[in-house]
A protein has these predicted regions:
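Predominantly a Rossmann-like dinucleotide-binding segment in NAD(P)-dependent oxidoreductases
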Residues: 53, 164-171, 175-272, 280-282, ...
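A structured beta-alpha segment of the ubiquitous adenosine-cofactor-binding alpha/beta core
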Residues: 97-114, 118
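C-terminal helical cap and adjacent loop that interface with cofactors, partners, or active-site loops
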Residues: 24-29, 60, 243-256, 270, ...
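Beta-strand-loop-alpha-helix segment that lines the small-molecule cofactor/substrate pocket
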Residues: 114-115, 126-177, 390
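N-terminal glycine-rich "phosphate-gripper" loop used for MgATP/nucleotide binding
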Residues: 119-123
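N-terminal secretory signal peptides and thylakoid transit peptides that target proteins
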Residues: 4-28
Length: 414
């Protein structure tokens, strides 16, 4: 089963081939401006967009869509009416197209949108994505795509159906859009790295509020509190470390055979069940070693480090890419001095928004971001489970178990 899972990277209709990666990279590198000139805004067809999840990042990315100039923010949905209304006021969305409660996304889908942007806690992504694709819409979604294996498989099925129906499905990762990362990865793929021995990834980000739980999980659905809850957000490793894991897969291009690791909860007064300190080793069938280290706390790290990055140690070269800091390919036949990755959180989203518009309006039916988004999610789930069990877990075992995580939605407004 593992060999089949690895092979599908090169067989799936929505898996990125090398040619597609280069084309996507060129498109991302050209999408560098926040807003289109007025003349270009008038020339480009507008996409009617619905945004599901209008809290911090949802409202923020909705503004980026609006600033692009060729999106009409047509409808909004959020569990909390005050959140939907605040975003609606800021974005000029008619009050009749602001929806709330758990089922608000259904009304948004029926409101006449062409596409949806999904920005809720990841627990809800599979259900929302499936409904959007079934309705014939294009999908733009945040990461991680799910919190468990069944959710990942549901996203895989939805993306496959989107491809069949000639619709776009884009998962918003930022590291692959940076010009320095793109060039360094292309050189490495073209023989510039040599024989890869070890991959080292890390994530040294902060924590999110983790207050005492209330009678229902309603209080966990805002202010990123859900990052502390494995069922709602996947936990810190799946939700955050996935940036670095996804970055590594951009070059490695295959999933591990197994993972082992140790993790614990180190934050003060925790109420969610997510661990926040991780040391993980991934084993690959060809002998490749990949280690990952993470601390989800509010302390410092070395001045030369960036909070999220990935290093590739090969013979003869060394490659570093990341969410910030200096990207470099050192040694080997295709050395690259690279440069500092700047403002990637916003710049990467802006590039992806531009790429999504281009794909939708040109009927490109592009779904090439999906394969690595699913495999990076499965890889982080594999690591999370190995750490929780303090045992080695194989990729095949994880898929065979097909474990479902359930959040208690009782008492919530439906």
């Amino acid at each position: 089963m593992h060999d089949q899972s690895t092979a599908r990277l090169h067989q799936d209709p929505f898996a990125p081939s090398r040619r597609q990666f280069v084309a996507a990279a060129a498109a991302a590198a050209s999408a560098m401006t926040v807003a289109l000139p007025a003349s270009a805004q008038q020339a480009q067809p507008k996409i009617k967009l619905g945004v599901v999840g209008c809290g911090g990042r949802g409202a923020w990315i909705a503004r980026l869509f609006k600033n692009h100039g060729a999106y009409d923010i047509h409808a909004l949905a959020d569990y909390f009416p005050d959140v939907a209304n605040a975003a609606g006021d800021a974005l000029g969305v008619d009050k009749s197209r602001r929806f709330s409660s758990l089922s608000g996304y259904k009304k948004l889908i029926e409101s006449g949108v062409d596409a949806v942007a999904l920005e809720t806690p990841p627990y809800f992504f599979p259900e929302h994505a499936r409904a959007a694709v079934d309705a014939g819409l294009h999908v733009y979604m945040a990461k991680p795509v799910a919190v468990d294996v069944p959710g990942c498989l549901a996203i895989e099925a939805a993306a496959r159906k989107a491809a069949t129906n000639k619709k776009c499905f884009l998962v918003d990762y930022q590291i692959p859009t940076d010009p320095f990362n793109i060039e360094a990865l292309n050189r490495a793929r073209d023989g510039g790295l040599g024989r890869l021995f070890v991959v080292h990834s890390h994530y040294f980000g902060g924590q999110f509020p983790d207050p005492p739980k209330t009678a229902t999980i309603e209080s966990r659905l805002r202010f990123l509190t859900w990052c502390n809850d494995v069922a709602l957000g996947g936990g810190y490793h799946v939700n955050a470390c996935i940036h670095s894991i996804h970055g590594g897969l951009l070059l490695v291009g295959k999933t591990p055979a197994a993972a082992t690791g140790f993790s614990s909860i180190r934050r003060d007064n925790p109420h969610g069940d997510s661990h926040d300190a991780f040391s993980i080793s991934f084993q690959f069938a060809d002998g490749l070693v990949w280690n990952h280290l993470a601390r989800h706390g509010n302390g410092l790290f070395a001045p030369e480090q960036v909070f999220s990055g990935c290093e590739f140690l090969a013979d003869p070269a060394f490659l570093r890419i990341g969410y910030g800091g200096r990207t470099i390919l050192r040694g080997g036949p295709k050395q690259y001095a690279g440069g500092d990755v700047q403002n990637l959180y916003e710049a990467g989203a802006v590039r992806n928004i531009a790429t999504f518009h281009k794909n939708v309006t040109e009927a490109a039916a592009d779904t090439t971001t999906v394969r690595l988004a699913i495999d990076s999610c499965l890889m982080t789930i594999l690591a999370r489970e190995a750490c929780l069990r303090a045992d080695k877990i194989t990729w095949d075992q994880l898929l065979k178990e097909n474990k479902t995580l359930s959040a208690d939605l009782s008492g919530l407004k439906t």
